[in-house]
Amino acid sequence: MRNTTIPPIYYCCAWYFIFCGGLAVLVPYLPVIFRHWNLSPSQIGIIAACKPLIGFGIQPIWGQIADYTKLHGQIHAFCLFASACGYGSLYFQKREFGRILAHVLVTETFGSGGFFLADNATNFIVSKHLERNPRSSISYGKVRLWGAVGWGYVFAPLMGLVLTEEKNAQFAPFLAYVILFSMASAIALRMEHHEKEVVDEGDDAEIVVMNDDEGENERMVGVASSSSRNRGGGGRGGRVGADGTPSKMKRTASFADFNDVSKRTFRIVTEPSAFLVFLLFLLMALSMALTDTYLFLHLETLGAPPILMGLALFFTCVAEVPVFFHEKKIKEFLGLDRSMLLIFVAYIFRQLGYASLKSFGSPWFVLPLQLLHGITFGLYWSVGVEFSRLLAPEDLRAAVMGFFSGMNSLGAFLGAICGGRVYDRVGGGSLFFIAAVGNTILSLVFALKMAFGKRVVPTTNTVVDNIIEIDMSGFVRLESSMPPSSSLSDAGERDDLDIDRSIDSRI
């Protein structure tokens, strides 16, 4: 009997479908459920704002723990199962604001690592799949689109139908959430996040021990066999073959301790050009939070029926799926800079449209505006994940991905808090008009920098290793020239931190 195994890429597709389906059966309906539990709109807004704030602080920590322990799959599964237990038991919580808020915050603390760790695994699995199948057209977006299918095409409409037909079935969203997130937790254990470590025990194997920049922790790195010595020494802490390319190096011992992971991650994400890009991601997330939190309130004041709100969610996924499917071609055609500019421009048109709905005379004009969600979220998330992947060395990708997810959460927090204050004072139409003006200013500054040859997205990852060049098509290139070195000891006299980064980026 033929022994068949499920390709890892299929686990990723199934995970996004199940996970986003789990979100769809509960998250869009939570404000309505909280309202039925006698929470005021301001209290609901506080809960909505605090959730992303917890994510901003906790998600990078989960990423660092995963990179330090290398237990990405187990941590991923734990976060999902913790979220299932937390939100599942929320139904039985006393209907008091303080208890509900505390319950949600504890749940988010332990469950906020579910999403970005899946993105980390998907990027790795897609890369390995393309190495084995160079002609494959698979990409991150073609995997991620299954989340939009699960959210908008299947589970959100299905739960809406259940709640419409069974008005007393308030437990249904919580029960469905527990079932789907438990399934996602089981799938997470099958997802790969990194190469399995292989110890070369050959006779020619050599172990080089290097101290970090504070001399506190030692790293052991297995390097090429002694035969490579005759072909040249390793520049910048590595070995260079006859063709000038670095020979492979593999870890044979544990990674640096947690403090070192945190410090290296901090250096990477706070490098000025990289941090500027993360700030732009934060502003995009702020605009997204304004839409997610206040669009339906604005539609309600315009007399929109509930069915229109459901169709608005459906239309977002209609546009999101093709964008995710073609995201690789879009990024290759536009580059990361122009892709980010396109996102800001799409927000301008989307928010101006929301502000003008009253002038249009009907809230139903919101439906064509929702098609821009494919750019404002689909392309935004794809660019953010791609930038994080290219910015980080392989052993820090989950940590950097967690920082991107954390900045997204901080933007959502600011959008919920600031947007609520503006909404209370001037209303939904003026709120979206002000946001459109802000995005117009950002777009003009962005375009001017590009026009004068100033790339906003950094083209060289100088923090990790200067040989890594991130071009605007989303590819990683190795520079042809490497500083010559006759022996490993020559490289050992260089700055310890530079050696560490060079080694880490090639593993």
Could you tell me what each predicted segment is?
Residues 1-6, 195-233, 237-278, 467-475:
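Juxtamembrane intracellular "pre-TM" segments in multi-pass secondary transporters
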Residues 2-52, 274-280, 285-312:
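Helix-loop boundary and gating motifs at the non-cytosolic
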Residues 30, 113-131, 379-393:
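Intracellular juxtamembrane helix-capping segments at the cytosolic ends
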Residues 41-42, 130-146, 306, 394-404:
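Loop-to-transmembrane helix entry/capping segments in MFS-fold secondary transporters
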Residues 57-71, 162-164, 322-336, 423-424:
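Helix-to-loop junctions at the C-terminal end of transmembrane segments
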Residues 81-95, 346-359:
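C-terminal ends and interior cores of transmembrane alpha-helices
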Residues 104-146:
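Cytoplasmic helix-loop-helix junction between adjacent transmembrane helices
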Residues 160-179, 421-440:
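A membrane-interface helix-boundary motif in multi-pass transporters
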